Amino acid sequence: MDSNKDHKDIPGNPSTAYSSKFHLNDRSNGKKLQILTESDWDFWVKNGYVIIPQAIPKSYTSRLAKLLWEFEEKDPDDMATWYATASKDMEMVELTNSGMVEIYNHQYLWDIRQYPKVYEAFTDIWGMDKLWVSIDRANLNFPSKPGFGFKGFIHWDYDPETNPQNVQGLVALNDQVDEDVGGFQCIPELYRSYETWKQGQPI
């Protein structure tokens, strides 16, 4: 596997590789699914994403959520602190007010990444046990209000032109029923029509 260093001066989380002999699981190895049900698998193949309920213990999500509030120097019970000017500068200034929290390697994050149910879900998707983990940050979003609109933008967290394919996991730390809150956006059908879709995009 070759390392793509073209991005080395660009901030963010680019893909760690652009070539690989490995591909997503096509079930041809006959290996039994560990976490996904057959219904889950069919949904994954059709939509390009799948939801794993109760993937990690509630205690894991609670302690990480508490850490994020503390790291951002905000109080979950005091809305006045939610919209205060950030005390930390972000290298990618376009991410200001996007909810991204610059925390990557805390043990709480690694406990989630390595939790058996999470790991086994990825082994189902890849069809192999030896996985390479890339890391990303956490996210803490607040309701939009005048003067503090959500400034995130829909994007890929990897270069879709590269091989191998990438699969990203997202863990919701709280149940969210308000459609106006949250940082995740998904277009399920795009992975099936990407090649056609990109032909109609401006260069």
Segments (PLM) and residue ranges:
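Hydrophobic side chains in beta-strands
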Residues: L140, V171-L173, C186
